[in-house]
C-alpha cells in the first residue's frame, strides 16, 4: 500500500507536528483565535506548551481535553458515556452516530473515552468547514481526516475511494478508532437515518464482498442524546428560509454561527450510548441480495441500534404530546417539567428574526426536533 496517497487528507503524523506548530504559531489569525479561546494565558506560554507536545494525543490532552470539559461544565447539566456494550478497550471501532453538533459530537466522545482509559478517535470532517488555513491545520493536529466535498462526480468517486481505503487502513493497521456521522450534515429535524452513501463509501475499501468489507470496519452504532439542542432555533429558521426563498443556501457566516451556538449554548444533559458491534448481524444478512437491498438492510440495522439506545428526557415526551394534542405521556413528566419545556420552546422561538415569521411552522419544526427521537425510539423498542 502506498501511504503517500493519504497525505492530502490524513491527520498529521507525530513527526510532522513541530513544523505545523511553528506554522500555526506564526499565523496571526491562529494567534487571535487561540487567545480568544484561552484568554487568561499569554500566547507565548501557549506556544511554548504546544512545542512540548510530541504526539497528537499529547496536544489533545494539553489543550482540547481541558477546553471541552470546561464547555461541558459550563454549558451542560452532565456529560456521560456508557461503553459497556464494547468491553474490549484495545480494539479499534468505527463509531457511526446520529449527528447533533458540528464540533462537540466527536469532541465530547473523545474526552469521555480518555476518561475510561481509551484512546481518542480520528474524526471525519467536511472540508466545507475548514474556512481558514489555520483551521485545516488545527483539525489535522486534532486527529481529523478530511472529507472533500465540492467536487465533480468523477473526483467525488476518486476521493471517496481514497478515504475508504484510508479508513480501512486506520482500523486494520493503525488499530485506531474512528468517528463518522451517519449522514452528511446534521439531521435538521432529528429524524436520524443512516445514508446509504456513507455505507457505500465505507465498502469501497477493504477486501472481499460488501459484507466482508463492512465487517473489517467493526461498526459500532452510537446514540447521542442532547436534552436541548442550542441550534434548534437556527435549524427551524433554516426550514422557513428554504420554504420561502427558492435555492436558499447557508453561508459560511451561518456555519460559523451554528458552530459558536452549538459550543456555547445550553445543552442540558448529554449522554453517549455505545451499542455493540454489528458484525454478528452483518453475518446474518443474505449476501445474495441486490446491493440496494443490502445497503437498506445494513442502514436499518444501524438505525435500530441508535433508536433503541437514545436517552429520553422530559422534553421529548412533552413535545410529542404537544405536537399531537394528546396526553399520552403525562404520567412521565410533571407539570413543572412541562411548563419548563413550553417556556424553553417559546424562548427559542423568540430568538428567530426573519421576514414574514411563520410562528406556527417554526413551533412545529422545533417540536418535531424533540418528538422525532421519541417516535423512532418507541417504534424500535416495540
Regions found by a protein language model. Give the residues of each.
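Phenylalanine-focused residue identity feature
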Residues: 6, 12, 21, 30, ...
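Membrane-anchoring hydrophobic helices of lipid-metabolizing enzymes
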Residues: 1-93, 99-110, 114, 136, ...
Amino acid at each position: 500500500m502506498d501511504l503517500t496517497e493519504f497525505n492530502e487528507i490524513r491527520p498529521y503524523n507525530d513527526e510532522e507536528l513541530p513544523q505545523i506548530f511553528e506554522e500555526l504559531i506564526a499565523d496571526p489569525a491562529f494567534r487571535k483565535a487561540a487567545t480568544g479561546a484561552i484568554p487568561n494565558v499569554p500566547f507565548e506560554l501557549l506556544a511554548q506548551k504546544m512545542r512540548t507536545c510530541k504526539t497528537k494525543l499529547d496536544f489533545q490532552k494539553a489543550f482540547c481535553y481541558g477546553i471541552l470539559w470546561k464547555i461541558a461544565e459550563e454549558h451542560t447539566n452532565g456529560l456521560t458515556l456508557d461503553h459497556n456494550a464494547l468491553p474490549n478497550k484495545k480494539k479499534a471501532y468505527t463509531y457511526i452516530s446520529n449527528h447533533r453538533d458540528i464540533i462537540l459530537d466527536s469532541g465530547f466522545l473523545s474526552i469521555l473515552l480518555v476518561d475510561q482509559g481509551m484512546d481518542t478517535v480520528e474524526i471525519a470532517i467536511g472540508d466545507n468547514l475548514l474556512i481558514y488555513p489555520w483551521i485545516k491545520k488545527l483539525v489535522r493536529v486534532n486527529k481529523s481526516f478530511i472529507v472533500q466535498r465540492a467536487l465533480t462526480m468523477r473526483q467525488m468517486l476518486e476521493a471517496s475511494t481514497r478515504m475508504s481505503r484510508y479508513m480501512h487502513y486506520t482500523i486494520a493497521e493503525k488499530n485506531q478508532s474512528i468517528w463518522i456521522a451517519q449522514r452528511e450534515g446534521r439531521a435538521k429535524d432529528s429524524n436520524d437515518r443512516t445514508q446509504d452513501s456513507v455505507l457505500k463509501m465505507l465498502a469501497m475499501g477493504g477486501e472481499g464482498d460488501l459484507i466482508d468489507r463492512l465487517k473489517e470496519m467493526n461498526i459500532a452504532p452510537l446514540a447521542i442524546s442532547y436534552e436541548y439542542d442550542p441550534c434548534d432555533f437556527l435549524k427551524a429558521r433554516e426550514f422557513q428560509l428554504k420554504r420561502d426563498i427558492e435555492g436558499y443556501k447557508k453561508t459560511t457566516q451561518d456555519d460559523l454561527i451554528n458552530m459558536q451556538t452549538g459550543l456555547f449554548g445550553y445543552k442540558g444533559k448529554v449522554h453517549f450510548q455505545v451499542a455493540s458491534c454489528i458484525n454478528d448481524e452483518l453475518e446474518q444478512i443474505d449476501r445474495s441480495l441486490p446491493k440496494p437491498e443490502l445497503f437498506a438492510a445494513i442502514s436499518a440495522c444501524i438505525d435500530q441500534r441508535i433508536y433503541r439506545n437514545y436517552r429520553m428526557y422530559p422534553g421529548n415526551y412533552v413535545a410529542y404530546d404537544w405536537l399531537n394534542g394528546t396526553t399520552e405521556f403525562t404520567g412521565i413528566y410533571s407539570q413543572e417539567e412541562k411548563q419548563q419545556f413550553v417556556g424553553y420552546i417559546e424562548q427559542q422561538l423568540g430568538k428567530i428574526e426573519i421576514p414574514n415569521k411563520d410562528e406556527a411552522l417554526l413551533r412545529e419544526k422545533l417540536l418535531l426536533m424533540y418528538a422525532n427521537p421519541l417516535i423512532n425510539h418507541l417504534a424500535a423498542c416495540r
